[in-house]
């Protein structure tokens, strides 16, 4: 979840800055100076949308290090760090990718992988995860993150986010144009304060709605990463036990009726915005691989 949250947050910030700068430069006025020019607006939206997501991808690794305080293990200083390096190296070799950077950061049990390219990625784990899980469970989590890298999930998410950004930028300006025309007393096509306010509000509203699409796609990729981890480890059992540990289930039991235990990342409406599927669904999917 941390990986997706950082990417989306950075993307939103980049899009917001680009929108403000381009508005100050008069690009919005140029597009609508002779009426609403939809083809030109679409090109503008594509450029802004994909530029924002690509910039977010390119800076994802340094942003992740900075925001989490992650420390890259250059020279292992303990047996745990040496084990982490050896384990990630082994998993990366199995997955057919180059050795990622390995980092540790202080925090609750969590892990993430990020980076613009498959062969220059970062895999990070929290101290909380290392302290609360067995080595087999940590290895399963690492396999899950390596699978994300091998699947090219960050690049795929960039493409999805770019398309989503395009529609958000496009639709917000179309709505802004018509609202401005409806409340404006001028017959010319100059933009008023109504346009600016409507575009800002629309980008926020459409951006929130679009995040549901991004979150849905992210949940789909999590199932694939779980399956990838099972393949790397030769069995789905370690990943099932790691997920059970994260969900607060006794990992040695793994009962069939997981739903009755109330394990869910985000219940109800909030589940639409969750980047991860419910843990019981992920374990059920892994069980089907046996």
Curated annotation (Swiss-Prot):
Q: Which Pfam families match?
A: Peptidase_M48
GO biological process: one example:
proteolysis
Recorded hits in InterPro entries, A to Z, give:
HtpX_protease, Pept_M48_protease_HtpX, Peptidase_M48
So what EC number does this one have? 3.4.24.-
Active site: residue positions: 145
What is the protein's given name?
Answer: Protease HtpX homolog
For this chain, the family text in UniProt reads:
Belongs to the peptidase M48B family.
């Amino acid at each position: 979840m941390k990986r997706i949250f950082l990417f989306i947050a950075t993307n939103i910030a980049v899009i917001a800055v680009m929108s403000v700068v381009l508005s100050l430069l008069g690009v919005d006025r140029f597009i609508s100076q002779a009426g609403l020019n939809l083809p030109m607006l679409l090109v503008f939206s594509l450029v802004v949308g994909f530029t924002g997501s690509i910039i977010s991808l390119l800076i994802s690794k340094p942003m992740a290090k900075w925001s989490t305080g992650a420390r890259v293990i250059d020279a292992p200083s303990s047996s745990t760090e040496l084990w982490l390096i050896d384990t990630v190296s082994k998993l990366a070799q199995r997955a057919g990718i180059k050795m990622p950077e390995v980092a540790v950061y202080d925090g609750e049990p969590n892990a993430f992988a990020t980076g613009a390219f498959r062969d220059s990625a970062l895999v990070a784990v929290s101290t909380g995860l290392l302290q609360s899980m067995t080595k087999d469970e940590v290895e399963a989590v690492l396999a899950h993150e390596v699978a994300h890298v091998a699947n090219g999930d960050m690049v795929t998410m960039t493409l999805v986010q770019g398309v989503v950004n395009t529609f958000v930028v496009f639709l917000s300006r179309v709505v802004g144009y018509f609202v401005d025309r409806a409340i404006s007393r001028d017959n010319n096509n100059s933009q008023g304060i109504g346009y600016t306010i409507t575009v800002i509000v629309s980008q926020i509203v459409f951006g929130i709605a679009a995040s549901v699409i991004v979150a849905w796609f992210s949940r789909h990729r999590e199932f694939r990463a779980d399956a990838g981890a099972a393949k790397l480890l030769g069995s789905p059992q370690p990943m099932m036990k790691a997920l059970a540990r994260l969900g607060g289930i006794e990992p040695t039991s793994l009962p069939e009726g997981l739903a009755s235990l109330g394990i869910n990342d985000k219940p109800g409406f909030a589940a639409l915005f969750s980047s991860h599927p419910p843990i019981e669904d992920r374990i059920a999917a892994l069980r089907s691989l046996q």
